[in-house]
């Protein structure tokens, strides 16, 4: 594409659908679930009034959405070179020149600044955790680890697990064991989720020279890593034992179900894409069900 063609593309307005791609709205929405659960659990466990906490919850959700969307937009800016190589990324506005670099950076930093302002309005810990999430995702994951080490997914899991901490401190102002437990659940969940996706796109990552674990170490090694993270999930519901035996039992069954699904096709080497797809779909359902369970059980306790 020549310069004139590029200008003609970037001077048009970006559609709402394209904006969603730029800020990775699906990823943002997924992270808002544990953020809300963290806030809700803080209300229940620290005896805050729900009605008086609604403004904090809303401001936390707005701030979290903005900082995550802004960080994702900056990630898209930095990843333009590799996204142009990967077939699954060809519809991104950053790849087909639907948005200029200048506008993309303005959008990214504008969202992050406003988002951080919202979080700091809540309290200092919320703003600081937001900054940790931004720096961790943009610097340590996007710029450094993603292109240099097979540990990139684990590195990215740390900032990716910050939302429930922000949710909690937005209400209570300080962390607790329950907040850390939610953080650990998201932290351990992410490698399983993203390794499953990486198995499905292993050839693409290899083509773009991104050292994802399946592309570098192969399917067997990746699958073993996924099982390790699944095992690490098993004791985490017990850290939330204050929610009661029912919660611990259901959450443990949810973990065991995922482990059982993983073992069903463990030996079928030729079926690796189907296996990865099943694990990926379960991971999506797991995130929603686990945190919905946190909210529902704590609501029952509050009533």
UniProtKB/Swiss-Prot annotation:
Its EC number is 2.5.1.141. The keyword Transmembrane applies. GO terms for cellular component: plasma membrane. Signal peptide: none annotated. It is found in: Cell membrane. It is a multi-pass membrane protein. One of its GO terms (biological process) is heme O biosynthetic process. Keywords: Cell membrane, Heme biosynthesis, Membrane, Transferase, Transmembrane, Transmembrane helix. The keyword Phosphoprotein does not apply. It catalyses: heme b + (2E,6E)-farnesyl diphosphate + H2O = Fe(II)-heme o + diphosphate. The chain crosses the membrane at residues 25-45, 54-74, 118-138, 166-186, 230-250, 280-300. It comes from the Bacteria. Pfam families: UbiA. Pathway: Porphyrin-containing compound metabolism; heme O biosynthesis; heme O from protoheme: step 1/1. Belongs to the UbiA prenyltransferase family. Protoheme IX farnesyltransferase subfamily. Converts heme B (protoheme IX) to heme O by substitution of the vinyl group on carbon 2 of heme B porphyrin ring with a hydroxyethyl farnesyl side group. Carbon 2 of the heme B porphyrin ring is defined according to the Fischer nomenclature. Interacts with CtaA. This is Protoheme IX farnesyltransferase. It comes from Staphylococcus epidermidis (strain ATCC 35984 / DSM 28319 / BCRC 17069 / CCUG 31568 / BM 3577 / RP62A).
